[in-house]
Amino acid sequence: MKTLLIDLDGTLTIDEEHVDYIDKKPNIILIQTLKEYKKQGFKINIFTSRNMRTFDGELEKIKFHTLPIIISWLKKHDVPYDEIIIGKPWCGYDGFYVDDKAIRPSEFISLNYEQIKELLKKENPHKDGGNK
C-alpha cells in the first residue's frame, strides 16, 4: 500500500503565532492535493509532535488533551486521513528532521507523484529505501 505521512502544524495548518490550535487556518492547497492522493488509493497518516514539549512526551496526556482538538480540526476542514499518529519527537525550534523519503510541503503541492518519485530517487536510488 502507498502511504503518506503528513505533518500537522505548519503543513496542514498555516503557522501563525498566538493562534490557538483549534483556530489555525488550513493550508487549503495542500489539503486539496491530499484529497487527490486519497483518490489515487493512498493511505494517509497524520504524524504530529503537537504538544510533545508541553506534556513532556507523555502520550496519555496528549491523547486526552490534544487528540480531540486535532480530530475536531481535521473534521472541520474536511481533511482526509486514515490514522493519527501522535508522539513524533519534537526537534526543537532550531533543529530539523532528516529523512531520505521526505519532501517539503511546497514540493507536495507543486509536483505530481512521478516528479516526487524522481526527486526522492536523487537521495536514495533504491525503490525500497533500504527498508527490507
Locations of the language-model features?
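Catalytic phosphate/metal-binding cores of nucleic-acid and nucleotide-processing enzymes, i.e., regions
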Residues: 1-132
